[in-house]
């Protein structure tokens, strides 16, 4: 299977500009004619750090009917591949417990919003609309938890696919036991052979350090992702088919307008300071008790990464390796 991830430096509140950037990347680096899947990050065209429902309202998109979906349908048909893209969904589900708006007035009806991804077939058919189940602090300022739990189902010629969005791979609300591995175990139980993660994953590295070597991946971040999929690595010891996980993250920085944030490493990002994204989009194949990195992008570069899931890996780590240690390329 040939897979591509489009790593973007999404600009807050500049949907048309971000779409134009994505189009320019695809024009300058045309995907192969036999591409099966193109994956974009979480909230790919809107930016991520919205501090309130009011701030994101102008950029909400009707369920599978807004600019992100329209773009995905167009690109899917143009390149003859599946497309997955993250977007802020305005549903027709009524929120029974709305919060007062900033002016102190609660509207008569408020519809639930979700942090979602839409999956489109090569013919432009909507195959899935997944709503993020585990919300990060930033999401909680405007989105509801997904109402159907994690997703694992057949998606056309892609086969059995598990879909996730960023925080989904973490312990629920950072409070569940570390080794519960809710998302990974759901994918495993569902028999997924492909796991697709759209992400807006933060880094604890300062902005200046992120800009020094933008072409180098944030290996500590990738190491953490692998840890969160330990059940797949362990299960692969007993044989069976390979499982491939695709991580499509974003790059760049945004102003933290939401609240004091804490990264997975425990670093606190104060309100009003910049938050940076870790990039490092990659694909990992789990087989024989090993996690094989097929290819990866840098922590600060925009572009298109194309790979074949049967490719020889850049390097791999085994189940018995200390995954908490920083990964190093050979």
What feature does the model see in each segment?
Residues 1-5:
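Extreme N-terminal starter segment of soluble prokaryotic enzymes
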Residues 6-25:
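N-terminal phosphate-binding loop and adjacent alpha-helix
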Residues 7, 121, 285-287:
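Residue-level signal for short segments within beta-strands and strand-turn junctions
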Residues 7-9, 41, 49, 131, ...:
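Residue-level recognition of beta-strand->loop/alpha-helix junctions
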Residues 15, 24-122, 129, 138, ...:
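Cys-nucleophile CN-hydrolase/nitrilase-fold catalytic domain and related Cys-dependent amidase chemistry
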Residues 19-35, 150-152, 182-190:
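Short amphipathic alpha-helices and their capping/turn segments at secondary-structure boundaries
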Residues 66-84, 170-302:
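CN hydrolase (nitrilase-like) catalytic-core segments centered on the catalytic cysteine
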Residues 74, 91-194, 198-199, 204-222, ...:
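Active-site catalytic loop in hydrolytic enzyme cores
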């Amino acid at each position: 299977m040939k897979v591509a991830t489009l790593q973007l430096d999404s600009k807050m509140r500049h949907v048309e500009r971000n779409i134009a950037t994505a189009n320019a990347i695809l024009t300058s680096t045309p995907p192969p004619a036999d591409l099966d899947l193109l994956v974009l990050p979480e909230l790919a065209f809107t930016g991520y750090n919205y501090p309130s429902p009011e701030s994101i309202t102008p950029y909400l998109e009707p369920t599978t009917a807004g600019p992100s979906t329209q773009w995905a349908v167009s690109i899917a048909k143009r390149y003859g591949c599946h497309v997955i893209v993250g977007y802020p969904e305005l549903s027709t589900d009524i929120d029974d417990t709305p919060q007062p708006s900033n002016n102190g007035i609660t509207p008569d009806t408020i519809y639930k919003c979700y942090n979602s991804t839409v999956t489109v077939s090569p013919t432009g058919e909507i195959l899935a609309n997944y709503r993020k189940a585990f919300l990060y602090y930033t999401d909680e300022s405007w989105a509801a938890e997904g109402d159907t739990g994690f997703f694992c189902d057949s998606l056309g010629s892609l086969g059995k696919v598990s879909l996730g969005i960023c925080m989904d791979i973490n312990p629920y609300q950072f409070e569940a036991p570390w080794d519960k591995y809710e998302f990974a175990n759901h994918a495993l139980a569902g028999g997924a052979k492909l796991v697709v993660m759209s992400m807006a994953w933060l880094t604890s590295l300062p902005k200046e350090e992120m800009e020094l070597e933008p072409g180098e991946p944030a290996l500590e971040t990738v190491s953490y992702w692998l840890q969160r999929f330990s059940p797949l690595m362990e299960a692969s010891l007993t044989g069976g088919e390979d499982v491939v996980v695709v991580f499509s993250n974003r790059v760049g920085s945004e102003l933290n307008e939401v609240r004091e944030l804490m990264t997975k490493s425990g670093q606190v990002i104060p309100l009003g300071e910049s938050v940076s994204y870790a990039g490092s989009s990659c694909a990992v194949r789990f087989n024989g008790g090993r996690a094989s990195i097929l290819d990866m992008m840098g922590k600060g570069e925009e572009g298109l990464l194309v790979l074949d899931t049967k490719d020889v890996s850049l390097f791999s780590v085994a189940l018995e390796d200390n995954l908490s240690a920083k990964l190093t390329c050979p």
